[in-house]
Every structure is written in C-alpha cells, then in structure tokens.
Amino acid sequence: MATLYVSPHLDDFRSLLALVAAEYCGNAKQQSQVWQWLSFADNELTPVSCAVVFPLMGMTGLDKKIQQNSRVELMRVLKVLDQALEPRTFLVGESITLADMAVAMAVLLPFKYVLEPSDRNVLMNVTRWFTTCINQPEFLKVLGKISLCEKMVPVTAKTSTEEAAAVHPDAAALNGPPKTEAQLKKEAKKREKLEKFQQKKEMEAKKKMQPVAEKKAKPEKRELGVITYDIPTPSGEKKDVVSPLPDSYSPQYVEAAWYPWWEKQGFFKPEFGRKSIGEQNPRGIFMMCIPPPNVTGSLHLGHALTNAIQDTLTRWHRMRGETTLWNPGCDHAGIATQVVVEKKLMREKGTSRHDLGREKFIEEVWKWKNEKGDRIYHQLKKLGSSLDWDRACFTMDPKLSYAVQEAFIRMHDEGVIYRSKRLVNWSCSLNSAISDIEVDKNELSGRTLLPVPGYKEKVEFGVLVSFAYKVDGSDEEVVVATTRIETMLGDTAVAVHPSDSRYQHLKGKTVLHPFCDRKIPVVFDDFVDMSFGTGAVKITPAHDHNDYEVGVRHNLAFINILDENGFVINVPPPFLGMKRFDARKAVLQALKDRDQFKEIKDNPMVVPVCSRSKDIVEPLMKPQWYVSCSDMGKQAADAVREGRLKIIPDHHSQTWFNWMDNIRDWCISRQLWWGHRIPAYFITVSDPSVKPGEDMDGHYRVSGRTPEEAREKAAKRFNVSPDKIALRQDEDVLDTWFSSGINPFSILGWPNETEDLNVFYPGTLLETGHDILFFWVARMVMMGLKLTGKLPFKEVYHCAVVRDAHGRKMSKSLGNVIDPLDDHIGIALEGLHAQLMDTNLDPLEVEKPKKVQKADYPNCIPECGTDALRFALCAYTSQGRDINLDVNRILGYRHFCNKLWNAVKFAMRTLGDQFVPADTSPAEREESVSDRWILSRLSTAVAQCDAAFRTYDFPAITTAIYNFWLYELCDVYLESVKPVFIKAKEDGSCERPAAVCRQTLYTCLEVGLRLLAPLMPFVTEELYQRLPRRRPQSDPPSICVTPYPDAAEFCWQCEDVDRDIDFIMGVVRTIRSLRSDYKLTKTAADCYLQCTDAATVSLVQKYSLQIQTLSYSQAIVPLMAPQPAPEGCAVAIASDRCTVNMMLKGLIDVEKEVPKLMGKKTDLEKQIEKLSEKISKGDYKEKVPVKVQEQDTEKLRQSQTELEKVKEAMDNFQKMM
C-alpha cells in the first residue's frame, strides 16, 4: 500500500479535503454536503472561535469590546448550526463523516474554554451532537476524554515570546520541513491581510472614542436590538403585563407567551362566548377552511400571504361577534410525499420502495409524516394564525379517508366515475400519471440541451425535424415536421387540410412507413394549419393530445411505442428496447441513411416537465379512472352566472367560464402507493355461464366499503353466489385533488350528519391563489354540488401570487424561497445556505441558489417579527396583481411597530398611574379643536377600515391604519397636545383641558389598537393589556375578542375641523421645508404668515399655538396682504391663501443663500418657459385632456407666483447684505 505524505502546513492539507470527502461518502449528494460543511467550518466557525478563545489563552492581545462582539458572533453561528442539527444525529447521513470531524474540531476550544452550562442549554442540539462525536472511538483515540467548560477561563497576558511569534509566525514552524516559495508568498499575503484587518479595527476603535456629537448613532440600529421575555410563564398561562415595557419594540419579547394563552382560553373556538354553536347568533356565522398545505415540508411566503389574509379576515369576523370557525388541515400530497420519502430512503439506506414492498413503504411514509408533519402547524402558530386546532384534519385521517371512500363509491355507483383508456400526462421516473398542475411548462426559444433523469448526457429540444414519407405506388413524397422525431415510430396517418389544393390528388392514398411494415393513410382534417410548414402533419394518436382527437375522428390505429419506463416497444429492431431519447438519435440517423431526412432547424416550443421528478412528461395511453365532468361543470358555471357564487376579483370569472364550458373529464387515478387506495375491485366469476371480463369492461368493476360489500354487489350483478366471486382490488390511489375536492364538508364529518356539518356548511369564504382556481376551487364546487346539493362556500377571494423583489416566481432552485420564520426571527446568510442542504436539489445545483441568496441578502435577513411580516403582506396584496415582495421592505413595518410602541409608552406616561377612562367614548363637549380633529381622523379611519374589509381591499386597510397612527396621532396630535400637559404641570388651574386630552388620547389608543388587532395580533395584545379598562369587570379578556370598531358607533367626523387642520398642516409642512432648506435644525425662527383674506388671518390666529409647536417656530405672526413681511425672510408658498416668510436675519449667512435663490429662480424660469411653450402649441387644446390642461394652468400660475416671491426674497437678502 502506498504511503501518503501529509504536509504539516494547513494550506497543503486543505487541498486533500475534497478528495477525502469524495472517497468516504456514499453518493454525490453526501460528498457535496460534506464539502459544504468543511467550508462552513473553515470560513464561519474557525475564525470566530479563534477570535474568542485566543485572547483567553494569551495567544493574542485582548480588546474587551472586540472579544465581546466575537462571542456574540460565535453564539449566532452556533445557533445556525443548532438549527441544522435539530433533525440530525450527525451532519451528513447516519454516521460520522469528515464533516463532523472538521466542524467538531472548529468548536472544540469553545466547548473547552468558553461555552458555560448556560450557553450549552441554549445550544442543546449542538451540545448533544458534540458530546456524541467526542465519545466516538475515532475521537477518543486522538483527543482522549474532553471536559466541557464549567466557567470561562480567565484572561492570560501574552509573553514577549508569544508577541514575537505573532509578529513572526514563520518561527512557529521551525521544526517542520522547509517551506516552498509559493507557501512563503501565501503567508506573506496572509500577514498583509491581518495587518489591514488590525488597522481597520484600530480605526473603528478610534471612531468610537470620538465625541458622540460628531457622529450620532442612528435610532434604527438601536431599534433592532433583541430583547427577550425572561419571566417564567407556564405554557398557557397569561403573560406578565405588570412589569414595565422594554425601552424599544422587540419581536421576541412581544410574541412570547401570548399564543399558548389564546389557545388555552379557547378564543379561537366557535364555542367561545356562547352556550353551543347551535344557538342562533344574530350577528351571523363565518366559516372558512384553510387551503391544506402539503405535508411535504415548510411553508413559504406564498403560504404566509394566504394565512395573513385569512387570519386577518377571521379575526375581523370574530371581533364583529360572529360565530367564527377557521378550520386547519394538512394535505397528504401523494406524489410530492412519495418522492420525498423515496429520495430519503435511497439517500440514507440505499433502498427503493420496491425493495421494501408496499406495506413497509407506507409505514416509512407515516413515520416521516409523524416526524416532519408538525413543522407546518408550528409555523402557522408562529404566524399568529387563530385556527381551531382541536378540529385540525389530515387528509389521510380515518374520518377523511372514510369520506373519500364514500364519495368515490357514490359517484361510481351513479356512473359518474368510470374507467377508460386515454392519453394521460405520464412521468416515466415516477411510473405514474400526474395532474396538469404538476407539469411545468419550460419555454424554449430554440435549440436547448436539457438534463433528463436516467441520461448521462443532456438531451436536445427546441428543434423541428423535417422528413419525407414516400407515397405508395409513386415516386412522390410528403414532407412532414415534428419536434419529437422518435414518435414517428407510432405514426398511423398523415393529415392535410380538406381545402389544401396541393394534396387533393392524395385522397384515398397511403404513404409507406420507412421502418415498420405498414401503410399509413392520408386523411383530411380541419385542424391542420395549411400555412404551417408544408401543410402536412404526421399523426401519432397514442402519443399526442391533438393527434388523439384526430385518431378518434378517423378511426385510426392507436400504436403505443413507449412502456411505463420510457423504453421503446411495439417496433422492429434496432429501435426495440431503446430508451426514448436514445431512439430519438437513432431514428434521425436512420432517416438520413435512407435519404428521407430533409432538415433540422431551431423551433420555439414548450417542453412539459414533471415538477416532482424533473422528467420530460410523455402523453401515454393508459387505462385510468375518470370523473365525468360535463354536467357538474355546467352547474358550477351556472352558479357563478346566476350570482350564487361570487369570484373576487371578478375578472377571474371569465377564466372560470372558459374552463367550465369546455371542461374535460378528470383523470383521478395515480400509479402510486401513498394515498387513498381506490375502493374498486376487478371481478372474476368462477361460473362457466359467465365469460371472463376484460380490464376495460366497467361491468367487471365494482366498488365497496369492504371486500364483503363489493363481493355482495358482484354476486348480485352476475346472479351467482358470493363464494363464486374472486376480487382483486385496484392498485392505484386517488389523485390528491379528489380528497381536497371534498375538503369543505369532509372536515365537518360528512357523510355523517354532525352538528358541525349542520352549522358550518356551506362555508362563507374560500381564500386562495388564482393559480389553483381550476385544480382545486372548481373541483370543490363541482363535488360539493354533486354530493351535498349545496355550494361549499358563497365567495371565492383570489389573493396575489408572491414573487421575489425581481418579479421571479419563488423556487428552491433559484434560492429565493423564504421561510416565513426567517423574516420572523431573522437568519444569517450561512443559515440560508444550510437550508439548501435539506432540499432535494442536486448537489451540482446548489451553487446557483447560493449566489442568489448572497446577492439578495449579503449579510442576513433581519429580524422583523410576525406582525411586521403580516402587515407587509396585507399592504402589498392587491386584487388581480402579483406581489414583488422585497424582504427588506418588511423591515420598514418593523420600524412602524417601534413607532407604535414608543407612542403608547409616551401616552401611558402622560395618562399616569391614576388615570381612569370614562365609561363611554367622548362626545363633543369640552374637547379642544385638536381633540375634535384627532377624533374625526379616528372616525374616518374606522369607516375606511370597515368599508375596505367588506370589499377585501387590504391595502386600503393598512393605509388607513398606518396613516392614522403615524401621520395623524404621532406626528400631529401627540406633538400638538404636549404644551397642554406641560401647562397643566406648571399651573394647576389648567388641569381640566389636560384631563379632557387624556380621555381623547386614551380613546385613540384603545380604538386604534382594536383597528390594528386583526393585522398585528401580538403587538396589539401586548399594548392593549397595559391599558386601563373602561369597564374592568365586563370588558373582554383579550383584544382578539373585543368588538371591532364600528362606523356607526364612532361617528365623529367633522369636515370643518378636518379642512382647517389640513390647511394648518400645509403651513407647518412649508415651514418645516424651509427650516430644512436653510439647515435650521435646532434654531427656532419667527414666521410671518401673509394671508390673502381676513378669514385666513383668523384661522392662523386660532391655530397659532399648534403651528408654532408643530413647526418648532419662535413665534407665528399673521399678516393681512398687502402688508409686507420684514426684510430678511425666506419665502415659500403654503397655499393660494397663505405665504410663509421665515425670518433668517441673524440666523444664517446671507451671502451663501443668495446664490441658492438665484439657482431656484433659474429653475422656475425654465419651468415656466417649458409650460408656456407646451400650452401655446396649436393642437394643445384638442389633444390634451381637459383635466391635464387645468393642471398645467395651475402649475404655471403657482410657478409664476413662486418666482415673484423668490425675486422678493432675493431683494430682501440684497438689502440685508
């Protein structure tokens, strides 16, 4: 055996890691995963481990700040590792690999010297894995027994020798072999990088030592600090609301403990607050079932969108006092789940499902489901989804399985379900028919090489091959073209258009197949496009959907040339037994050899690809079970036409009619093992008077709830005794959409007459994406009408489809699929990379999504919280429009949460501990103008939300709430009433206005939080629980069951006050703009407001205190035009009624400001010239809309007025100089 020399230098050793990883791994995917973990250890763990441990060991100097930051970074990286290890014993596979060795060595020193027991409690999965590793024989042999850190080691000072070693690292390797020139160069580069890094750190440290005034920290950074809720609270018990609120909003603090309490209190159950669900509720019933997500994995942002909308609606209806049920569930996802488990078995055990057999394989799927299935429910709870978990259903549960069986048997007995041999979408890799929704349409612009499972080389698509058929008994030939040349082996006709004069002489003629001993008729059919190619088309009825219809019309032969695995059959050698795409090459070459090949050229086309297996989908003739849909489709279309079923937005109705009016029968059988096995049996009768049945003969098929029932049916049908009947149950399972189609009533107990079914069926609403309008929604409607005689719901609301910030559909292969919890708790870039290891992506495909993740999230996805995520999704959803959601924009709504938090904290301090709210909401008695204005704005927000909820206008809801809290309550009202509270403190006789303000402020907080509660359940609950109650003994215990503000109750709109304050805020904004222009950030100036009439002067006088406070002015002086303002003022127009003159004399450098005004004057003159030129054009009046003309005229007038004011200001400045 050859001796392997290992250099003592790490850089030489690293080059061997990939070879070792490849040598000792079971397959390519594991090799790739090992290499990724090696990269993780080398690039993420080792540097930060050294940064923490080396100063403690005296190997480097100690900078406490840097060392503290490094420790925080170490914990962050280890938490990523902890998350990845949650479902694993070892990092790759089920045994120790090089990945475990490398990563364990990277964390060895932290575990020995840094990570105390409290740290290890946080890192339970990492600690479990590390202790498992170090106790393996391979580790014990080299490391011996490792003791874990009990208390972090004290700092050791560096010796002079060690200092020298740090400066001259070459000295550390004197005992090793001499280094090469390349190694010395590499180490020199490393030293250079280290020096630059140290210089950078020194610069950062110097900056931190500078006075705060030179660079003020941004408040946004402080807002993102993580604050946790650490008060021990047993699950289900109410959270502590007595302790003071933290200084800033933190999702981890706010979202802790509330959900288990909501659940335990039963707030999400329809029974809450009433004796029984059966009692009449005058406010009505709201019922909605969740579109059951697939059990195969995790929710993505698309699921988060639908759940944010559904939960917002559910909470709104619940707060309106309706009997409310939102029913959870999970779909067994037949093909998707089977594929995942099959890959898992092959990856981990090298076993296929056929090796195990059907029964054992099903056990493995159930085992996987029980381990992984709850993750989706966990995610839904983290999103705050107020589902009644006691009613949760899984489509393979006994209750739902019984309903599926009953539905099949009833429809089969009626003849609605039947068996037939037709073309289906076939996946050769899965050996199963698949539904249209599982077929991806891969659009090609021309010649393209695509990977196909089972083929080493990529296969050519996107080309059109032309070849000739010889006319029998003639030298003439007919040229046809095809994109699938291999299918010509199954051709049974050549079709031309009946009106095509070029081929009239071929009526009744045949052409000769070059490889098969058969003559092919020339048929005339209207479907042929005379203008395409030669106007002649090859017909392969058994392998093309259009050709199938032609074959039926002309009674052609249906020759199947492919078996279930994609091998060529029913043809002569040499093609017999070839793989389909190998046959493609062979047929092409054979045509060339016979001089019947004409040309090959690029051809734009759509290639059907199986979304599960990535195989090319083949149309294949297979015996399958079908549902007859013509009658049910007509009923479903009529329901929408007659207004009994409403589709929102209504432009989807046309799509509905197109599908329903042209519906085809539905193939419901799948050649899988996981799913609802079809309860149908093939009958064999042991009686000479009964001839043997054929597979396609429906007379020899019977369905039954049990074999005994099926046998009795068969015996009765053939008039023989049951003992002469032998049954063979169908091997296939039902399409997943079949069980999903009866979901609205099967979850309520159908076919049994349960109380839930009587109360909650039909449901109120279905909310889902428009992409499954036909696959799921239509089938629920059809099956609901067929089996219950009722529509399953009254309305269908289609939300948008979530795309990434670049408008791309979210896809694992693109790396842009985001787990909603990543937005909720935040995740580092390496965590996103680690998630890719858990997908079914080929190892070679992982690098592309990694690059996408690095480009979109160069550092991390910041922690935003559930409330911000929900609000963002609702804010950006618009009827009929997809969402291009930039995850970073969610961060803006996290800042909104912080603004909300600070506003309530300020208000609570202002209200004081002794504040007692009035029994009723305020009426117009003692309220000031500011009070009446904010109550008017609150009333407007209530009305806007009420109207928008009823029309599913979620952007209008979020806009109304956001504007009220941020721009009206925080920016205006809270600022304008501060002087009232200050005056009350200084003068006890002014307490009454302050008391009225407090009542108004309380009303705004309490009603504003209730407005927001359906969208942001966690932060509103946290803040609501801190508010005093109007009626402490009778008010609801939680904000989620308080009444939603009603427009009829909160009717405080005051148009006069709104109009006045709107004018005042225009003045304030103008003053603020001037202050900003002249950099008067901390200096209050006198403002002279020139008014055009006495009414405006009076208005300014009335609101002078508010203007002064909100604009941070020294004094507000109203002037009646033409009374001039003093010299030395900056001028800006607030409106056509008021001009702002802000005194700058003595506050700014006039010599610098005059050039600014000259620049503004030039811009205005150009603008006026451009507008004047536009308006003076001869065809302006005829071509430009009247509204635009009015806008242009107004712009011109305002620009001319502003120019005059600028000139006036320049004159004033000239006088000041």
UniProtKB/Swiss-Prot annotation:
Domain of life: Eukaryota
GO terms, biological process: valyl-tRNA aminoacylation
Short name of any one Pfam family annotated for the protein: Anticodon_1
CDD domains to which the protein is assigned, alphabetical: Anticodon_Ia_Val, GST_C_ValRS_N, ValRS_core
PANTHER family, A to Z: VALINE--TRNA LIGASE, VALYL-TRNA SYNTHETASES
NCBIfam families reported in the protein's UniProt record: PRK05729.1 (NF004349), valS (TIGR00422)
Protein's name according to its UniProt entry: Valine--tRNA ligase
UniProt source species: Takifugu rubripes
Gene: vars1
